[in-house]
């Protein structure tokens, strides 16, 4: 590779994720985005369970049955001279841990809001995570083909609830059955909407200028006048787009449209490729690593099992932070202090995997993992580095898991430890007995674990309720005090899947008492990988 080519390759990359509340239309948007990137020719819209066209980005058996995206997949496609990497994050109620970690691997996010509902609780939680790194956010107000709330009201809500300034880029003309299109504030153009074009890219029907009589003819006098009145208000009351404020995560450009009707998606893609940052530098324990550096570095943010039902394989997803991956490269697996030759890394088009010949900073590659790679691992070309900031969250829900067939205890433990390494669930083994406690951030994770134990490890397991309120990782620098703490609290201590000591609290009162009683012991709600 010529040295001149490298900065050009990195600068054309855009790596982003979509964040939304369940059912705000995220999977549909993913489909339409890929359609624009020509990755798929007709968008397989996510329909009911019986339909054979399942969404292209949902690919685990259980996802197909339920019509939700459970695992984060990665898709790369070209758009406007850029190469876009889209990380699909599970939007459903519970898949939070995986989703949170995915947000550590992107340089910008698209926030999708259901315009009939406004800002919802899951969106608030995800926005908090993007705030940790001030990730730039673009906003798409979706579902304009339905009856929606007043657009000004939606902008106010985003500003007040999510504490970010809004700069409308497009503005809707009507909504529901009367939805006619959007006006672009910065190009002074109106884009007209046609129904029934959801599966293909619409022909652009553009009217130049706000005072153009063609506009009145196309949308009707009333709506045209309403648009002009609203725009006067908007231009007086809202923020102008400011690139620096956007890059610092203080302001979000807002686009209106309908993903199902495939309208408005290209508007935010244009914004993404024009404004969103190219791959950024990242903090490691000893220094910051710039994306312009020639030596390869990267970190693993997710592990996924069985992307290929024919093989019991697991793939570790690695975000390339700097340098270039080339087939057959020797990389240092820093945590293990081992050098490995990576000859068969993967690139992704969800579920269709192709072997990567090369990848640059900003790209995501898949490494085959036979149980040696963990979330948070760093790979380099020899430098002893560890990237920081990839979190594990204390679970909020707990159940005891046991076998229908007690002879399969070994398989059960193996399955649970593997699933916990993958971040699907957390496992705790109490020091006092042989129980296995499963901890999750949401209820759906429990179902996923049982169905995967059955299909991948041939183990039938059932849950029982258990009296656990929360868990905290514990550490103490004073060995003597720690020993006393361990001796007196043995009945509440457990090891997690990575053999880290954890305090399992039956009630919050119990936890508070323990924290008061042992001020030298640190109780952690999150743990960095």
From Swiss-Prot:
Keyword list (alphabetical) reads: Cytoplasm, GTP-binding, Nucleotide-binding, Protein biosynthesis
| Cellular component GO terms held in the UniProt record | cytosol
Principal localization reads: cytoplasm
* Gene Ontology MF annotations: GTP binding; GTPase activity; guanosine tetraphosphate binding; translation release factor activity, codon nonspecific; translation release factor activity, codon specific
Q: Where does GTP bind?
A: 20-27, 88-92, 142-145
GO BP terms: regulation of translational termination
Q: Which intervals hold domain tr-type G?
A: 11-280
Q: Where does this one sit in the cell?
A: Cytoplasm
PROSITE patterns on file: G_TR_1, G_TR_2
One Pfam assignment: RF3_C
The family assignment reads:
Belongs to the TRAFAC class translation factor GTPase superfamily. Classic translation factor GTPase family. PrfC subfamily.
Its job = Increases the formation of ribosomal termination complexes and stimulates activities of RF-1 and RF-2. It binds guanine nucleotides and has strong preference for UGA stop codons. It may interact directly with the ribosome. The stimulation of RF-1 and RF-2 is significantly reduced by GTP and GDP, but not by GMP.
Protein's name in the database: Peptide chain release factor 3
Species this chain originates from: Pasteurella multocida (strain Pm70)
Q: Taxonomy-wise, where does this protein's organism fall, top ranks first?
A: Bacteria, Pseudomonadati, Pseudomonadota, Gammaproteobacteria, Pasteurellales
